[in-house]
Amino acid sequence: MKHYFYSFFTLFLLFNCSENKPEIKKLTQQELTETTEFKEASPEKKQLFSELKAFQKDLQSKQAQKIPDYLDCPKRIEELDLNTKNTAIRTDVEANSFRLSTNLVTDNFDLIYNELDLNIINEAIKSIPETDLLANDNVSANVKIGECDYHTSILMKNKEVEFDIKSATPNSECKKDQKWKFVSNGEILVLDHRKML
């Protein structure tokens, strides 16, 4: 009898203690185009939304060959506000006139993905319903990466998308507050600059 009680108790704890993340329903393209938010969005907003979603999908699937285009490689390091202790990145940028090279991004994608906080940006875009992105110019989400919590906001105006990332965990292992700005070139979002706050 005790065995059954402990089994039930363990199962009960397992279900109650697991994270209850709200599931964001992904709409098909057809469903999305039928929403009020999509119908009421301006053509410019639809274009910016489309580029933002393409960026997120490439980040999610880790399309290493496409990411240098988004980062506008070769990109000057001061425009990225990049002061890294990572020797692979530092050696590469010093050898490339202090620019982040295309080869570095493709050859060391996971390193760049985490070092440049693309993981936080990816999770932020993913966690916001598409209809909210279409209906609002400024949206926000809380993102957890490992043991670190971040409050992220996405501001979409004209042809610009800004990501404002604020650390909610007072821990030296967590990323510092920063702001990213991407500008649409009519086809994709291209990094304008990144600024540590």
List PLM regions with ranges.
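Sec-dependent signal peptide recognition
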Residues: 2-8
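Short, low-complexity N-terminal intrinsically disordered segments enriched in polar/charged residues
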Residues: 20-57, 61, 69, 79
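C-terminal motif of bacterial Sec signal peptides marking the signal peptidase cleavage site
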Residues: 15-16
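Short solvent-exposed beta->alpha transition segments
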Residues: 32-35, 49, 68-146
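Exposed beta-sheet edge and beta->alpha loop/turn motif
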Residues: 114-197
